[in-house]
Amino acid sequence: VQPQLPPDSIIDAEGCYLLPGVIDEHVHFRDPGLTAKGNFYTESRAAAAGGVTTVIDMPNTVPPTVTKERLLQKIEIAQQQSLVNFGFFLGATPDNAARLKDVNPRLVAGIKLFMGSSTGELQVEDRPTLRTIFEQSQLPIMVHCEDTPMITAKMKAYKKKYGEDPHVRYHAEIRPSEACVKSTKEAIALAREFNVKLHVAHITTAAELDLFDPNDKQITAEACLPHLMFASEDYERLGARIKCNPAVKYDTDRAAIRAALTDGRIRTIGTDHAPHRISDKIGGAAKATSGMPFVQFSLVSMLELVDEGVLPIERMVELMCHNPARVFGIENRGFLRQGYMADLVLIKPHSPWTLPPNRIESKCNWSPMEGHTFNWRVMRTFVNGRLVYNKGVITNENLRGRMITYMPR
């Protein structure tokens, strides 16, 4: 910045850190069709309040984002509602698998593939369709890896033993490490065979981490906040609030994922932000819905891990800002550089505060972090150079983010 330029305004940032705005490459903002849970307006407010300036939304909406027409519909919704920048994944299905080579690379961050049942009806399991998807895709594939037959058999056995809705404490046993590892191995083998860039979503197990090479730019892995912050013992305290797919697993898995943040096996951090009405979270491993809101508290939660010595703040910025831009080829975002968009977040350390329900911006109005005391605060968030969030307040309800653009990949 040229020092002789006159400032439009002066911001007191004494004692603060200025970072690139967070790029959350894994959110479910629920538009269209699931707006009782959240929408682009409410969830982008939560993002802005958390220092997240760019999000990439997943395709398992109603209807699912699996055609150009539905993608354009979602783009229009985001343009009208989103306070932060936005991008999208196109869902892979048996119906569109043979046409994935024709997807406009300027419109999407990549292809989302569900190799395992989760929320929505997008899972693809038959081998011929999977091969077609990997053969046809010209874009990065982000994949949810779990083996559904293994999970189905486990659920049947646990229902026989514990009744129709086993306690949520069994969720990690019903969706075990073996199901993740088997599916991840298959996805990696297909990516190697067809020379496709693969990003494996939400790693949950220590065993999966052995499948990744820190120096491999083709095959990469994501960690998500639920699996970094929680472990199986937290089911007793938080119940189905932390039920998600893949499941929050064991303390040894969490420790391994945290260690992989610094050795390069984890390339990005996302939230898998997936709001549900609190009434939908009643029940156990079978009946409670899977997913939790997290986009508002991802940055301050990761800064706690910085304070605990899990990773340095520079590495956190790489995982949450730089690398999402690199992996998906996002243009002019993710870095504090001349010529880049001014997506910025100002954060302050040594400023403890405890989360009350009335500070939650997500439409669902609950968080697994309620009652938690954070040591960092998001002071201000700037999206495209404009102040969107200032010390607890959305500054202008009419500001809108932009659709992100991509470099050749």
What positions do the PLM features span?
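Metal-associated gating/positioning segment near the N- to mid-region
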Residues: 13-81
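His/Asp/Glu-enriched, well-ordered alpha-helical/loop segment
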Residues: 165-195, 241, 262, 267-269, ...
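Histidine-rich, glycine-flanked metal-binding segment
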Residues: 1-19, 404
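Histidine/acidic residue-rich metal-binding segments in metalloenzymes
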Residues: 98-269
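A glycine-rich helix N-cap at a beta->alpha junction
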Residues: 76-92
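Histidine-centered catalytic micro-motifs
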Residues: 21-32, 142-146, 203, 271
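Divalent metal-coordination and catalytic microenvironments
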Residues: 15, 26, 47, 51, ...
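C-terminal cap of metal-dependent C-N hydrolases
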Residues: 284, 338-404
